Structures are given as C-alpha cells and as structure tokens.
Amino acid sequence: MMPIRDGQPAPRGASYDGKGVNFSLFSQRAERVELCLYDDDGVETRLDLPAHSGDIWHGYLPAVRPGQRYGYRVHGPWQPQQGLRFNPAKLLLDPCARGIEGEVTDNPCFQSGEEQPDTLDSGPLAPKGVVLADDFDWEDDTWPRVPWGSTVIYEAHVRGLTQLHPGIPAEMRGTYAALGHPVMIDYFQRLGITSLQLLPVACFASEPRLLRLGLSNYWGYNPLACYALESRYACGQNPREEFQQAVKTLHQAGIEVILDVVFNHSAELDENGPTLSMRGIDNPTYYWLDGQGNYDNWTGCGNTQNLVHPEAVASTLDCLRYWVEECHIDGFRFDLATTLGRTPEYRRDAPLFQAIAADPLLAQCKIIAEPWDIGPRGYQVGNFPPPFAEWNDHFRDTARRYWLHGDFSNGDFARRFAASSDLFQKQGRLPSASLNYITAHDGFTLRDLVSFEHKHNEANGEDNRDGSNNNFSYNHGVEGLKAPLLVTEHRRRSIHALLTTLLLAQGTPMLLAGDEHGHSQHGNNNAYCQDNVLTWLDWKHGDRGLFSFTAALIHLRRRIPALQQDRWWQEGDGSVEWLNGQGRQLNRLEWEQGVHRLQIRLSKQWLITLNATEEVCDLVLPPGKWHAVPPFAGEDNPILLTVWHGAAQGVCVFQEKS
C-alpha cells in the first residue's frame, strides 16, 4: 500500500474522488488516531492519520477503492469521571460512514471498562465502515414537492410493509426494492397518499438486553451510523443503490419519501453500554454528561446527544444534506425532537434549529418534529419554530376521547379539527404545522384501539410493564379481536368516525400503514422488538371494504378547498361553520357543554355530520339540497336528504348541489 498523505479535513467520513480515498474524523481531545483497514480475510492494517486541522484528523490513500472496510482506533486519556473514555483496544465506527458491514453482537469485547480500560480487542467483531462511490444515475429525477395543504402522510416500516405481500417476489419482500415494486406503487396511488414516511432506515443496533431474550430491535430507533443505510433491508449487495432506485421510482409516481431520523441518542446506551463509535472518539463532545461523567438520560435510551456543540450542528446538518443530495429524500421526521433544541434547557432558537431554518436545501424539505423527550420541560407541543410541523398528540387524544369515551366538549373537538390554532397559529405558522394522527407506530393500531381496553405486551419480555397505559381505547364491551356481530359493527362505526375525523380535519393527516385494512398487533402497543407476523402487515386477510372507505375519504379531502388551502379559517370567510343538530350555529352552551352532535360546514358546499353519542338521532341539515357522497353513498345513487338519521357513533358527509 502506498504511504498515506495528509489529505483534507472536508468532507467528513471516507470520500472517494476516483483516484483514492480521503479519510476525515473529528476528535477534539484525541492524542492519536489510527485508521484501520480490513481486507477480505479480516486482516487489519493500521495507519496513523498524519494530519489534523483544528480538531479534524485526516489522511488520503491513493490506493484505496470503493468497497474498502475500515474503522478507527483513537488514543487519549482514560478518565471516566471527566467523561474521557479513549480506548484503542476498541475499533470505532466512523460516525459519517456511508456504508456499514457487520452487526453489533452481545459480546464482552464491546465493553469499554470501568476503573481501567478494557483490553479485549473488538476489531474482529466490530461493524466496519465501507467506502462507497457516489455514482447512482438519477437521470431526470425531481422532487415531487407536494404542497403541505395537499399532503397525506403514510407511516410505514420497510420490512413490515411488504414482508407478507403475496404480489411481490419472495426474495424482494421486506426490502427497499419492494417499496418501488409496481404492486406497491399501484397500491399507494389507489389509496391516495402523497408521502411515504419510513421508520428509521439508517444503520441501527439491537440492544444487548433484547439479544439475550432472543429478540431484536425492529423499529430501528437505536442508531449506529446516521449516514449509512441499514443493510438488513436490502435484497441485493448494494443497500444504498437499491434504496436510491426505490426513491426514484416513487418520485416517478409523484410520491414523496420522508425519513424518520434519530439524532437524540445512540446505540452506545449508558455507562455500561457497548463502545462502538462516538464514546471512544470524543465522548464529552458528543454526549450530555453530568459532573461525574455519567450520561444525562433525557431520551430514555441511556444517553443524550449534545447538539449544541458546533461540530454536532455541522455534522447533523451535513448528514441531512447528504440524504437529500445523494438519496433525494423529501423530508425528515425527527425522533424526540426536543433534544435537538436542548442547550441543555429547551430553546426555540437553539443552534441546530437556526441552522436547519437557514439552509437553502433543507428549506425545500418537509421538516417534522416529535415534540417531546423525557427530560426537564421535555413536552414542547406547539413550541417549535418554523419550518417544523409537529406531531399533535392533542388531536390524537381529543379524537379518541370524543368518539370512544364521550369526553371533551364540541368546542374542544372543533379546536383540534381546525388544526389546533391555539397551539400553532403563531410566528407565521400555517395549519399544516399541526400533524394530525390517531395512531402511529408507537401505540395501538386503529383496529386494536377499538378492540382492546388494555395493552397486551407480554411478548416483549418485560412482564407487560412497557408501553403506555393511557391509550384512551375502548373495546366496546369485549376484550380482543373476536366479538359478536353487534360489537363488530360498533367497532366498525368507531373506526369510520376516527378515520373521517383524521382525513377531513384541517392540518396534515398521517395514516399508520395497515390501519386502512384493519391490521392488528393483538393488543401489543409497544411492538418495537417484534420482527415477526405480529407487526408485518397481513395482506391476504385485509379488510377491502375498509381500504375502499379510507381511499374514498382521502380522495374526498382533495375536493374540499378549505382543506387544501393551508390557511387559517377565519369567521365569516366561508371556510367553516359550526352547526348544531338543528342546522343552526352552535350557541355558547352547545359549544362548551352540548351533547356530542355536530355539523361542520366546509367551503359552504360540504357538510360533515357527527353523532358521537350512543343513541340514534336525527340531525336537521341546514337549508339546501344535500347529497350524501362516497364513501357514505354511491356515485350513481346519491342520497338527497334534509334530515340525517344518524346511527350511534355515526358520521356522514354531504355535498350541496344546485
């Protein structure tokens, strides 16, 4: 091998220029950095990075080509109480590696040490970075740029979405390639969604505790390397190229791809967790530590990344730009996003927020926050700055309690239906900032929400202690999926009411994959470690009628101007009227204490009627010629009504025609 040259400090990671590879690694406190190259037989060659510019260590190797496996051994003091955990016995993964080979196992060689550094060499078993070439042919691919007002998000897991799909070749099921298969493209288009939001696809690890139980991390919220695609979702040898092709195909169909990204913590867990990467590279820079060198655990995952440091801001921004530039991603959903704004207290003007807002490339992307973590003042719904949209759990809980428990007033329901203006109508934010959902990957599926009163998480190995107990679910009198026909009919009505609320409310709707055809996880509301038929969508036995109902609602949403314009509804502008059961405007008493019967008139010619009571009732429609529309009546046989005979827990939509 040729002698290593000084190289350049940028870009971060391993960059192939057609002649060789530049290696660049940040470490403010390191005393020496060894680049470790591995051949096909696992033989290691060590080379000191010869130069460092400020806190960036770097070197260039002319002889190296794409496919090269590599890692780092970083030398420095071992002073855990000061947060310094350098240990050259541990091979460290490049945080900016574009490709990864190998998986983390439950092996003692990954332990760093306590009073003294552990001397077991992790090199033979540690995951390695892989050098990649940026040579994918995007041809004339363009980002769909779906307006926020027209956006309908579909949250899905790469494996779970297609693992059991009979229309996809067996070798392709559960992979990136399956996302772009014609069967799935056709399905997305018939359903009507505009944006596919994927649970984490960046490389992640399974926690040692799960491995000991014979389980694995299924969701992927345990990140190992945020630039690299998870190889277990690839059916071929090149995960990134396979993913790029899927994105390209989805774009050709006009469908956006949004990634769930995890920058709040890492797979290194707490002080007793494995040393895999950042802990051994520059622990005090990458993580929030207390005065004794222990990790601040504001994420519930053992550690919390420090995203105030200029290097952390720069590398996070670079990672986001990488996904947009190299993989043509359309947007990001940030897991536990309060952590991104910690300084360590939460600030709307935190450095990373300002950097995202100022970046011209990211300004064209959809930016979504999960607006909480478990740290001090971690709940920040409505308090994120533009351009963030936010998961609105107020919408979720109000919709569930209004329909399933008879809680909240008509006014409370209307406030959430109108994009939660009390939370989001500030600092120039638009209604689309309220990302509305009834269910998500975390919690009950929609079918389980109306079938189980209690969680059933025994399979997770924690004696049913994990998962939320505050689900606001209702089993309609029978626990579990099997129930008498009358109970099944009541559940169907509740599902229809909740879907109608979600898909015809102002704001940005997000639908959980599988809810549109009745997927169940049999009462498990925390299936993060269930990579099996419990979480994989059952396509053979899906409820086709429910799919048709959901698709019709999405297509109906497109026809209602008040839901497409992404501007706040104002009194008297014709966007909305709130009416009682007699077709008259709600008075104050009905607004605050009235029975749960409501009519919502949108854009003057559309009328949504709701009966969220347990009794059949008649609602007098406002003056006009009102025709029930699909999915509440057939296209060829619209029903003309002046009074709606509303079933208990019933809903209907009408259009006024001259």
Curated annotation (Swiss-Prot):
Gene3D superfamilies: Glycosidases (3.20.20.80), Golgi alpha-mannosidase II (2.60.40.1180), Immunoglobulins (2.60.40.10)
Keyword Hydrolase included in the entry's annotation: yes
SUPFAM superfamilies to which the protein is assigned, alphabetical: (Trans)glycosidases, E set domains
Family of this protein: Belongs to the glycosyl hydrolase 13 family.
Protein EC: 3.2.1.196
Pfam families: Alpha-amylase (PF00128), CBM_48 (PF02922), GlgX_C (PF18390)
Molecular function, one GO term: glycogen debranching enzyme activity
InterPro entries, alphabetized: GlgX_C, GlgX_Isoamylase_N_E_set, Glyco_hydro_13_cat_dom, Glyco_hydro_13_N, Glyco_hydro_b, Glycogen_debranch_bac, Glycogen_debranch_GlgX, Glycoside_hydrolase_SF
Keywords of the record: Carbohydrate metabolism, Glycogen metabolism, Glycosidase, Hydrolase
CDD domains: AmyAc_Glg_debranch (cd11326), E_set_GDE_Isoamylase_N (cd02856)
Pathway(s) served: Glycan degradation; glycogen degradation
Function recorded in the entry: Removes maltotriose and maltotetraose chains that are attached by 1,6-alpha-linkage to the limit dextrin main chain, generating a debranched limit dextrin.
Protein name: Glycogen debranching enzyme
One GO term (biological process): glycogen catabolic process
Catalytic activity: Hydrolysis of (1->6)-alpha-D-glucosidic linkages to branches with degrees of polymerization of three or four glucose residues in limit dextrin
Active site: 335, 370
Site (Transition state stabilizer): 442
Originating species: Erwinia tasmaniensis (strain DSM 17950 / CFBP 7177 / CIP 109463 / NCPPB 4357 / Et1/99)
